[in-house]
């Protein structure tokens, strides 16, 4: 006569197996050739690192260094304050990066809340003082931009002062001629617009051929 099993004394690593059930294999079966199962043989050959004879095939890990070889701001080593790889722009590069800013020690038992805030304030002020911030270098960088893109700075330095806002800089060429529509105001602002109208504007034409223009637009 079989003894009765006390479930309270059965170890936790025991488990019950139902003899009436059968094991169901996982689908897809990882023991199969999944590349062939899903029809990826052609793609796998295109990206294979080695050929069937063992020779090198496609190089997947392409280096980015050749792509940035001509860039003046490239870094082979990520610059930090500690390694000094930032060059002349190091102080500007790190000034507003929280991960690279000098973090004051955490508030301890001997530091009051006011002392902690004062320490943070001194850290932020130091970001804009030498040697953390080089104003001469910033001025030099801006002057280089001005020499490289003179048209972008043309309206900023006329006569040693900032030029007034010119509404014609935002005007649209509605008639498509490249000239200002008002003949009286074309003396000083006779420059052609960069983007000419395609003729689809519904503005009222001011030229003598206005009727033909309207007919053409209606047909379109």
UniProtKB/Swiss-Prot annotation:
Its main location: nucleus. Residues 178-189 have a biased composition (Low complexity). Transmembrane segments: none annotated. Residues 208-220 have a biased composition (Basic and acidic residues). Residues 171-220 are annotated as: Disordered. GO terms for molecular function: transcription coactivator activity; transcription coregulator activity. GO terms for cellular component: core mediator complex; mediator complex; nucleus. It is found in: Nucleus. InterPro entries: Mediator_Med19_fun. GO terms for biological process: negative regulation of transcription by RNA polymerase II; positive regulation of transcription by RNA polymerase II; positive regulation of transcription elongation by RNA polymerase II; positive regulation of transcription initiation by RNA polymerase II; regulation of transcription by RNA polymerase II; RNA polymerase II preinitiation complex assembly; transcription open complex formation at RNA polymerase II promoter. Keywords: Activator, Nucleus, Transcription, Transcription regulation. Belongs to the Mediator complex subunit 19 family. Component of the Mediator complex, a coactivator involved in the regulated transcription of nearly all RNA polymerase II-dependent genes. Mediator functions as a bridge to convey information from gene-specific regulatory proteins to the basal RNA polymerase II transcription machinery. The Mediator complex, having a compact conformation in its free form, is recruited to promoters by direct interactions with regulatory proteins and serves for the assembly of a functional preinitiation complex with RNA polymerase II and the general transcription factors. Present with 6116 molecules/cell in log phase SD medium. Component of the Mediator complex, which is composed of at least 21 subunits that form three structurally distinct submodules. The Mediator head module contains MED6, MED8, MED11, SRB4/MED17, SRB5/MED18, ROX3/MED19, SRB2/MED20 and SRB6/MED22, the middle module contains MED1, MED4, NUT1/MED5, MED7, CSE2/MED9, NUT2/MED10, SRB7/MED21 and SOH1/MED31, and the tail module contains MED2, PGD1/MED3, RGR1/MED14, GAL11/MED15 and SIN4/MED16. The head and the middle modules interact directly with RNA polymerase II, whereas the elongated tail module interacts with gene-specific regulatory proteins. This is Mediator of RNA polymerase II transcription subunit 19. It comes from Saccharomyces cerevisiae (strain ATCC 204508 / S288c) (Baker's yeast).
């Amino acid at each position: 006569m079989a003894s009765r099993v006390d479930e309270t004394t059965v170890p936790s690593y025991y488990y019950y197996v139902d003899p009436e059930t059968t094991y169901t294999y996982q689908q897809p079966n990882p023991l199969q050739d999944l590349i062939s199962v899903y029809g990826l043989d052609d793609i796998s050959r295109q990206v294979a690192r080695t050929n069937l004879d063992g020779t090198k095939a496609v190089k997947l890990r392409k280096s980015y260094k050749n792509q940035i070889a001509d860039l003046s701001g490239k870094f082979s080593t990520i610059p930090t304050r500690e390694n000094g790889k930032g060059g002349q722009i190091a102080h500007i590069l790190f000034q507003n990066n929280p991960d690279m800013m000098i973090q004051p020690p955490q508030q301890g038992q001997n530091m009051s809340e006011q002392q902690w805030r004062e320490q943070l304030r001194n850290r932020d002020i130091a970001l804009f003082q030498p040697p953390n911030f080089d104003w001469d270098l910033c001025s030099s960088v801006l002057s280089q931009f001005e020499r490289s893109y003179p048209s972008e700075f043309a309206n900023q330095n006329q006569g040693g002062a900032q030029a007034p806002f010119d509404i014609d800089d935002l005007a649209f060429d509605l008639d498509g001629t490249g000239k200002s529509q008002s003949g009286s105001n074309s003396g000083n602002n006779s420059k052609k617009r960069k983007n000419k109208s395609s003729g689809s504007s519904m503005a009222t034409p001011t030229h003598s051929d206005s009727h033909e223009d309207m007919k053409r637009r209606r047909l379109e």
